[in-house]
């Protein structure tokens, strides 16, 4: 869905200030094959990212310190709740956990009945909205980040620019799903297309949850479903 040229335009895009609020989005992983990846956003502009492989206790401490360093309030931090992300819940009580399988979120009362026919789940909804943001060139990234090199399961010292170009392949429709709305390709299948776990791109698109939540995010229906 996202073409190579689409991402190159994002890489060269002018700074997208948005609301200017500092937020962070993360894909949780402890010591093992996958990377823990966390992005710093200012509005719709990516200002920084951190990639780590640490044990659970050390990672929690490191994330708390990084959020303070970045000036991100806990209520503006989202992370994937699935699996080991459950461990984070007790340490970040005010954060917005991203539950992949939660129901899609309606922005108005009128949308509540129809939204479930547009998207299979919350992750599919956010992935599609992120796709639109890229197509409309409404996000940007600090150019210096693109040359930073990272390693992971199946790749070694690869520039971020190349990693994101490879991982964009994870954002595609699951052709095996029924016709009921957009369903994102499952992660197992995405790994086959990408060649490794798409931790950078997944954590990138989680930021879209903030376009669906209000300040009192605990009241958003489906967001806290386990």
Predicted regions and their residues:
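RNase H-like, metal-dependent nuclease domains and their acidic two-metal-ion catalytic environment used
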Residues: 1-120, 124-128, 132-226
């Amino acid at each position: 869905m996202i073409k190579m040229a689409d991402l190159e335009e994002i890489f060269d895009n002018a700074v997208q200030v948005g609301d200017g609020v500092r937020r962070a989005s993360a894909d949780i992983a402890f010591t093992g094959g996958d990377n823990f990846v966390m992005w710093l956003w200012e509005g719709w502009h990516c200002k920084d990212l951190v990639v780590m492989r640490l044990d659970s206790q050390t990672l929690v401490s490191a994330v708390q310190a990084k959020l303070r360093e970045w000036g991100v309030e806990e209520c503006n931090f989202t992370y994937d709740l699935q699996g080991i992300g459950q461990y984070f819940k007790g340490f970040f009580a005010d954060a917005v956990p991203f539950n992949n399988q939660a129901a899609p979120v309606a922005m108005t009362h009128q949308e509540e009945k129809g939204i479930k026919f547009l998207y299979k789940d919350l992750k599919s909804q956010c992935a599609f909205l992120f796709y639109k943001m890229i197509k409309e060139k409404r996000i940007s990234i600090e150019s210096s980040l693109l040359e930073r090199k990272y390693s992971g399961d199946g790749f070694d010292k690869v520039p971020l620019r190349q990693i994101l170009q490879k991982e964009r392949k994870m954002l595609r429709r699951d052709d095996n799903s029924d016709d009921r709305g957009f369903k994102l390709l499952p992660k197992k299948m995405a790994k086959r297309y990408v060649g490794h776990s798409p931790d950078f791109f997944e954590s990138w698109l989680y930021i879209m949850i903030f376009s669906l939540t209000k300040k009192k995010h605990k009241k958003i229906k489906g967001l806290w479903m386990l």
